[in-house]
Each structure stands twice: as C-alpha cells, then as structure tokens.
C-alpha cells in the first residue's frame, strides 16, 4: 500500500456519456480534457486532509487499482487535483463506498480556491443526494431524496458547473439543478467525511466550450 500526496495524470481526449437531454438547459460542447490515472502514485495533487492511498480494489478499471481514502478520524477528507482553475466544467468520477459507521460517502469538490469550494456528495447511509458550499463551515444549497448508493458497489458522480448553474448526477440520473454565484472558478478534488473509507476511479475533467 502506498500513501500518496502526488499523482500522475494523463491529458487526452474524453467525452462524457451522461445524457444532457434529460433536463432543460443549454447545449454543451466539450471534448478535450484531463483523464486522471488513479491507479498510480499521485503527482501534483494537494492533500488537504485524510490518508489517500493507491491500492487494489475489486472492479477498479485500471489493473484493479484505485485511489482510496482511509482516514477515519477527520471531520472531512479532501484531496485536490492538479490543473485548473476551471470555471465552466464537467467532472465525472466513479466511487465505491467501502465502509463506515458514521458516514459512507463519496463526493466531488469543484471551484476549490483558498479552502472554499462546492461539493456534491452521495452517502450509502443516507437517502439523500446533496450540494453544499464550504466557506469557513458547511452550508447546504440543495438536496433530493434518493435510494442510497449500495455499500461495496461502484457508482458514478458527475457535476456540470456553467456560470452560476450547477447540476449533479448520480448513476447517470440528474438529481440536482441549482443556481449559485458564490464561487466563480477553482480546482477539482475528491471528498469523504468522518470514517468513510471510499475508493475513487476514472476521474475526468472536461472544460466546457461556450
């Protein structure tokens, strides 16, 4: 097991497959972006809190290896990817909640700057899908009731941030559609809470061409 504070990433061409026609919104055009290889030791990442390791995880897409957050005694665990800042962007990641008694969540951080950021997260122990902003404390912007993600299975999170419009998907279903102009741009990251041990795979960041 390798504890990582750095990581390699691959710059390439990627197209996300989540349907945009499922909601009322502008057509998006985005193809070129960063696809991060979370199966290798990290380079250029900033660990804000937590113990982020690359290890074997069943169902991981690259040689069975994925990025896992293993700390269990922090309020929140955050790691921020290299690249950016991004304003208008689509981000997708696979996550697998492995264990947790207090919390079993996985989240996408976006528009991260100087400790302030937006977060969209799902929790295998709760029947809700939520959008938060963090600015010297957590504040909720939007929530919707869902069937909780299954512990021990892979799920997909996706966000689109375009201007003040923020949309969030869980397993290719759009569940959040909110407007907030608090943070204009920033970096991308991953998040867990409390004693969540969670794996992450296939992180893709695609700037939106307006």
Model regions: which residues?
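Ligand-recognition surfaces built from glycine- and aromatic
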Residues: 185-210
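Short tryptophan-centered beta-strand motifs in secreted/extracellular beta-sheet-rich domains
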Residues: 93, 153-161, 166-168
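Short carbohydrate-recognition loop motifs
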Residues: 57-77
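Short, aromatic/His-centered strand-loop micro-motif at the edge of beta-sheets
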Residues: 136-156
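Secretory/extracellular carbohydrate-interaction modules
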Residues: 71-130
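Extracellular carbohydrate-recognition regions
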Residues: 30-49
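N-terminal secretory signal peptides and thylakoid transit peptides that target proteins
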Residues: 1-17
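Short, solvent-exposed beta-strand-to-loop segments that form ligand-recognition rims
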Residues: 171-189
């Amino acid at each position: 097991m390798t504890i990582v504070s750095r990581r390699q990433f691959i710059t390439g061409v990627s197209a996300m497959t989540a349907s945009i026609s499922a909601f009322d919104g502008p057509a998006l055009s985005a193809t070129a972006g960063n696809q991060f290889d979370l199966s290798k030791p990290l380079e250029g990442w900033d660990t804000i809190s937590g113990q982020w390791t690359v290890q074997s995880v069943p169902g991981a897409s690259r040689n069975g290896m994925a990025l896992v957050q293993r700390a269990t005694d922090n309020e929140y665990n955050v790691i921020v990817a290299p690249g950016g800042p991004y304003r208008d962007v689509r981000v997708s990641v696979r996550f697998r909640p492995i264990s947790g008694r207090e919390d079993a969540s996985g989240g996408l951080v976006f528009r991260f700057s100087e400790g302030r950021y937006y977060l969209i997260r799902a929790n295998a122990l709760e029947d809700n899908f939520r959008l938060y902003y963090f600015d010297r404390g957590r504040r909720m912007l939007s929530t919707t009731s869902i069937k909780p993600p299954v512990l021990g299975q892979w799920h997909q999170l996706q966000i689109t941030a375009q201007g003040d419009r923020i949309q969030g998907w869980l397993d290719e279903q759009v569940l959040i559609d909110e407007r907030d102009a608090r943070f204009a741009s920033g970096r991308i990251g991953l998040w867990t809470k409390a004693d969540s041990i969670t794996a992450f795979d296939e992180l893709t960041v695609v700037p939106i061409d307006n």
